């Protein structure tokens, strides 16, 4: 019991960060549909959903009814809890498989840890919409564990629970029809079924339910007009290699190095070359050392669970769906835990420290290598998921602010997809999808807050920055000059910055007013054409966010750039600066009209050399060709030294 609790807590720790994440990809579509459909629609297949998986949608609909929305923390917590429970059930299953021995406890604990850290589960747990995979796995494992306990003479109530789980599993995901196959594999490889007759007696109710469920699923798909046909042979071959990579996950990264060493080798060949010999060698050694039943259980489970996707899905879908290996990951985790089983069996017969050390090293290398590799891979994905959260914060804050103005928000360079610079595995797309083409950040705002916020999304490539991850932005491609009319009609302009270590979405400013009378009570005017009225600022994790309030007096006759310099208030030494066009590079004063008043926000990234203290903020304007600054006058029409004005003193703590 203590080991199961420890495994459960470990599972919560691995993916606990996910409860803070925003929704993504299909979540927006699913929740929109659920908000207008009833539970009856869901169970009758009339909710417009792509797949008939009513159980997870029922959970979300009940939450929606009870809370009036789709609270992200609650919905993400369900995925995380299911995953952690699955880890505990993996331990229980292997413990029972090994007749409740110390060996079963040790091997089960190791397998549970590897299961919880399986790298290709990075999509299934943090993505709310992938609940189908942790949920069906929970129902399948719970059904098998309770079935075995009931057959061992425990409470008859466990038999009822087991059969109920078997009935419900297919309604979570199509893989749920494999409960009977999983139970049969368990009984055969554990030696609990002595002959075929006993095996049939123990499993026939589960086979009956599974076959009825499979027939029902087929009928529903045919009724809905969904295709039910095997994938093309090429896809099946590619799918097979992709799943081999998943099974061999601790060794499979070698394939990326092989690609660099052998230019004529393609990714499929590299995966096979890196994976198959390792899998064959490990299986051979484990069988020769008396672990044939565990090898059969692990490999058999993995094979059975990936078979539906291998046969039916196109490779283009599979290669984007590492979550498809979630149910099968138990088999991979067990397979790579078998060296520990060998060590446990041989431990008592090893009479010297040297012999025990020699036996422990291979097992430790395999398990620790798998743990370290997986943990590093998952940590990088957690970082990418966190970036989507950070990018969302500013957008959500801006979108939910009460505003009588119903004009669109203009969002520029918001992330739609983030991926590592270097791939770990030769096959697959290892990035984190966020906003798909068929959805929009407006849907994100609605799903997270319940607020419908009209939004226009643009990608301005000349303002994209090199960053530590690869990324794609969501929206239509525009140049900054072409975007000027959109800036004038937006109630707020949001800009996602990639300049720092972390993403941040800021309010870049907006057109505050038009056709305003000339205001001579300004901080400074420049060439009698442009005036800065005031400035304010706030410290943010990425630096100093400065907002300048401008008024256009006359149309400019040349391209200009504006600057904000932060200098030591005592010495005048430059500490940080930001030169460029207003609104984080989006708005060109050349197109401002007389009487326009603009709020212009820009980010000053503070170097690590900036010490705590007081700093003056200076503002000026100069021609884009770099020639002398425009003459700056104060409100009394006196020329300002250096043609710049101090708009305030900021204290850096």
Region roles according to the model:
Residues 1-451, 486, 490, 494, ...:
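Polytopic membrane enzymes that build or remodel cell-surface glycoconjugates and lipids
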Residues 396-653:
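C-terminal luminal/periplasmic domains and tails of membrane-associated envelope-modifying transferases
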């Amino acid at each position: 019991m203590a080991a199961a609790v420890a495994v459960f807590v470990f599972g919560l720790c691995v993916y606990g960060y996910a409860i803070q994440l925003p929704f993504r990809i299909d979540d927006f579509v699913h929740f929109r549909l659920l908000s207008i459909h009833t539970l009856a629609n869901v169970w009758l297949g009339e909710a417009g959903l792509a797949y008939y998986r009513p159980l997870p949608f029922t959970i979300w609909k009940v939450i929606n009814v009870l809370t009036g929305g789709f609270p992200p923390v609650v919905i993400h917590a369900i995925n995380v809890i299911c995953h952690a429970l699955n880890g505990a059930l993996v331990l229980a299953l292997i413990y029972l498989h090994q007749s409740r021995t110390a060996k079963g406890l040790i091997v089960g604990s190791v397998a549970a840890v590897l299961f919880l850290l399986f790298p290709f589960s990075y999509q299934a747990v943090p993505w709310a919409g992938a609940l189908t995979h942790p949920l069906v796995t929970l129902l399948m494992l719970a059904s098998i564990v309770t079935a075995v306990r009931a057959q061992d003479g425990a409470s008859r109530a466990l038999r009822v629970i087991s059969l109920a789980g078997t009935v419900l599993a297919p309604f979570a995901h199509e893989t749920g029809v494999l409960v009977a196959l999983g139970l049969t594999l368990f009984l055969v490889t554990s030696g609990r079924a002595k002959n075929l007759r006993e095996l049939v007696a123990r499993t026939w109710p589960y086979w009956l339910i599974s076959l009825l469920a499979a027939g029902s699923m087929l009928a529903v798909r045919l009724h809905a007009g969904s295709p039910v046909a095997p994938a093309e042979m090429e896809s099946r071959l590619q799918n097979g290699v992709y799943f081999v990579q998943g099974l061999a996950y601790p060794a499979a990264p070698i394939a990326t190095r092989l690609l660099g060493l052998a230019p004529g080798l393609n990714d499929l060949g590299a995966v096979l070359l890196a994976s198959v010999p390792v899998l064959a060698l490990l299986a051979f050694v484990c069988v020769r050392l008396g672990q044939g039943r565990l090898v059969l259980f692990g490999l058999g489970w993995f094979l059975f669970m990936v078979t539906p996707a291998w046969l039916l899905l196109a490779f283009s879908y599979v290669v984007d769906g590492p979550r498809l290996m979630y149910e099968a990951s138990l088999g991979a985790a067990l397979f790579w835990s078998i060296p520990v089983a060998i060590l446990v069996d041989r431990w008592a017969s090893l009479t010297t420290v040297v012999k025990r050390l020699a036996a422990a090293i291979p097992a430790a290398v395999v398990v620790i290598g798998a743990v370290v590799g997986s943990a590093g891979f998952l940590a990088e994905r957690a970082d990418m998921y966190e970036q989507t959260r950070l990018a969302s914060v500013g957008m959500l804050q801006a979108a939910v602010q009460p505003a009588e103005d119903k004009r669109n928000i203009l969002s520029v360079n918001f992330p739609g997809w983030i991926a590592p610079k270097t791939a770990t595995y030769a096959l697959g797309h290892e990035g984190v999808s966020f906003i798909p083409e068929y959805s929009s950040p407006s849907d994100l705002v609605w799903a997270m807050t319940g607020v419908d916020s009209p939004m226009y999304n643009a990608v301005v490539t000349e303002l994209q920055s090199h960053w530590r991850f690869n990324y794609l932005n969501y929206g239509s491609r525009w140049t900054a000059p072409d975007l000027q009319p959109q800036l004038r009609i937006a109630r707020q302009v949001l800009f996602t910055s990639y300049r720092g270590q972390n993403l941040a979405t800021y309010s870049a400013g907006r057109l505050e007013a038009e056709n305003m009378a000339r205001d001579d009570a300004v901080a400074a005017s420049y060439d009698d054409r442009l005036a800065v009225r005031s400035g304010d600022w706030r410290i943010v994790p990425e630096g100093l966010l400065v907002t300048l309030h401008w008024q256009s007096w006359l149309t400019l006759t040349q391209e200009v750039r504006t600057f904000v310099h932060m200098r030591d208030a005592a010495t005048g030494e430059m500490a940080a600066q930001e030169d460029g066009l207003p609104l984080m590079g989006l708005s060109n004063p050349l197109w401002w009209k007389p009487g326009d008043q603009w709020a212009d926000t820009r980010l000053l990234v503070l170097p690590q050399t900036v010490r705590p203290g007081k700093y003056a903020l200076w503002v000026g304007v100069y021609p884009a060709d770099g020639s002398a600054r425009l003459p700056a006058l104060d409100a009394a029409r006196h020329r300002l030294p250096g043609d710049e004005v101090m708009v305030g003193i900021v204290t850096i703590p």
